[in-house]
Curated annotation (Swiss-Prot):
GO terms for molecular function: unfolded protein binding. One of its GO terms (cellular component) is prefoldin complex. The keyword Chaperone applies. Disulfide bonds: none annotated. It holds the Pfam family Prefoldin. This is Prefoldin subunit alpha.
Length: 144
């Protein structure tokens, strides 16, 4: 019986790790959404001849003036860049935010489902341990 309890205990730990990984994914999604929202705010608030900072990497920036605030250049992947109207980019970013919201909702549902299974497993495990204690007159030990 101890072997069965150990196996269930390890399974319970696996569910806990799965929930933790899902929560980390959810945090990444929230960060991506925040970055997109910040980009939308920046693009919509940009004015011609406004001073801006251009990131050079490694925490270094260069001062510049915005020359054309109606268009932006976006990376399309594999060193391909496209010039697009800001309004089109905002639409694209809002669509990405919607997609991230859907993915986040799916992850939340999976977290809830996994947590529910783990909670039931924990209850079953506790009941088995209590039953063993009653039969043995003492506390069983889980060997790890």
């Amino acid at each position: 019986m101890n072997e069965e309890l150990q196996q269930q205990y390890y399974q319970l730990e696996m569910y806990g790790q799965q929930v933790q990984k899902l929560q980390e994914e959810l945090e990444k999604i929230e960060l991506m959404k925040m970055e997109l929202l910040k980009s939308i705010d920046s693009m919509e608030g940009l004015k011609d001849s406004e001073d801006i900072l251009i990131p050079l990497g490694g925490g270094a920036f260069i001062k510049a003036k915005a020359m054309d605030t109606k268009k932006v250049i976006m990376g399309a992947g594999a060193d391909v860049f496209l010039e697009k109207d800001i309004s089109d980019v905002v639409v694209d970013f809002n669509k990405s935010i919607e997609d991230l919201d859907k993915a986040g909702s799916m992850i939340i549902a999976k977290i809830e489902e996994t947590a529910k299974v783990a909670e039931q497993m924990q209850k079953d495990l506790e009941e088995k341990v209590q039953a063993m204690e009653g039969q043995m007159g003492g506390a069983p030990t889980l060997q790890m």
